[in-house]
Amino acid sequence: MANVVVVGAQWGDEGKGKIVDWLAEQADVVVRFQGGHNAGHTLVIDGVTYKLSLLPSGVVRGGTLSVIGNGVVVDPWHLVDEIARIGTQGVSITPETLRIADNATLILPLHRELDHFRETANATLKIGTTKRGIGPAYEDKVGRRAIRVVDLADEALLGAKIERLLAHHNALRRGLGIEEVDGAALKAELLAIAPKILPYADTVWVLLDEARRGGQRILFEGAQGALLDVDHGTYPYVTSSNIVAAQAATGSGLGPSAIGYVLGIVKAYTTRVGEGPFPTELTDAIGEKIGERGREFGVVTGRKRRCGWFDAALVRQTVRTSGIDGIALTKLDILDGFETIKICTGYRLDGRLIDHLPASQADQARVEPVYETIDGWFETTAGARSWAELPAQAIKYVRRIEELIGATVALLSTSPERDDTILVHNPFED
């Protein structure tokens, strides 16, 4: 029996929600280990759609413990709102079903304000953030001045920590011409929200270690995609945390040996939200068609996603940097009806053929995709639950992807419904 880490293998929005829900039904514990409420995921269960952004997917499954790990930055006000919103759909979240790492960093109003100011102040330098304060909160964490969940329980220490935090932020705000933050007001806001957060606080690394030693199945749920990883992504057009599978250990407090099977979620084509390089982007009618069919709009922001052909070179990179054992291929049905389909196998840079995306921002902007064209299929793949139901050309497309990325398909998703899934290998049985 293996614990399972789920990571997006592209730029996010790969369809992790459905796959995580499918796995969560078999898990005892589901853990979020990085990011914040900047990346949404959609679950469709018994015809009911749940949209989550901070809460782990396990919250909609009875009998599953959900955990927000220390690698996550937590907006306490958003968390309270999300718990209430999910509650209106009949999902009861209590301290018995949700635990939050007491050493997790908090996102504060000043982080959201700074994020918004930076992103709108200079259009030529914008990264394409969600303006939700994620980056500035991580900056404070690394700068050792962050307010953490545990600090909400100590009013005296909280005041001292706010004073230290504002020594930095108010100096910065003066330089930017932004009104300074009043420490007393911020403290009052935090003390008001504290009773709604502290009941969920726990020493999560101990809880998870006990679960592991007790033989419980742990599912580590990644947010976004590995190509947005702060080290291994298309820097600087990335998020502010590590997303690759190794972060599951760091962001939860468990050792690397606790990570078992790494499942990469891969869309049958490529999408990206916001700024940054996108070698296979389609700005023509084909790109529009893929976007319309796939309903490619962000769960959190509603922003339209950029669409393009499948980039095997990029996914191959992620397979290596995350140690992916197998993939879940999603949205194959969106490609139904295309006469021909292209797959990017590598790039041309200044006349040279290369098999990976270079780290240089300038080089990333100049690479030209090298395509392989295969015949499409006109039969539907939507709702297929076995290989026998798939058109021969669709199977050929899947097999070619496996060859190019160096990883096999463990699951194949053919619609948003959880049961429309072809199981090749159950990651928990590795």
From Swiss-Prot:
Entry binding sites for substrate: V299, V300, T301, G302, R303, K304, R305
Entry note: cofactor: Binds 1 Mg(2+) ion per subunit.
Residues that, per the record, bind IMP: D13, E14, G15, K16, N38, A39, G40, H41, T130, R144, Q224, T239, R303
Molecular function GO labels: adenylosuccinate synthase activity; GTP binding; magnesium ion binding
Pfam families assigned: Adenylsucc_synt
ATP-binding keyword on record: no
CC per GO annotation: cytoplasm
Pathway(s) served: Purine metabolism; AMP biosynthesis via de novo pathway; AMP from IMP: step 1/2
Cellular localization per UniProt: Cytoplasm
InterPro entries assigned: Adenylosuccin_syn_GTP-bd (IPR018220), Adenylosuccin_syn_Lys_AS (IPR033128), Adenylosuccinate_synth_dom1 (IPR042109), Adenylosuccinate_synth_dom2 (IPR042110), Adenylosuccinate_synth_dom3 (IPR042111), Adenylosuccinate_synthetase (IPR001114), P-loop_NTPase (IPR027417)
Sorted UniProt keywords: Cytoplasm, GTP-binding, Ligase, Magnesium, Metal-binding, Nucleotide-binding, Purine biosynthesis
PANTHER family according to UniProt: ADENYLOSUCCINATE SYNTHETASE (PTHR11846:SF0)
Subunit and partners: Homodimer.
NCBIfam families: PRK01117.1, purA
Function description: Plays an important role in the de novo pathway of purine nucleotide biosynthesis. Catalyzes the first committed step in the biosynthesis of AMP from IMP.
Protein's name according to its UniProt entry: Adenylosuccinate synthetase
Organism: Methylobacterium sp. (strain 4-46)
Gene designation per UniProt: purA
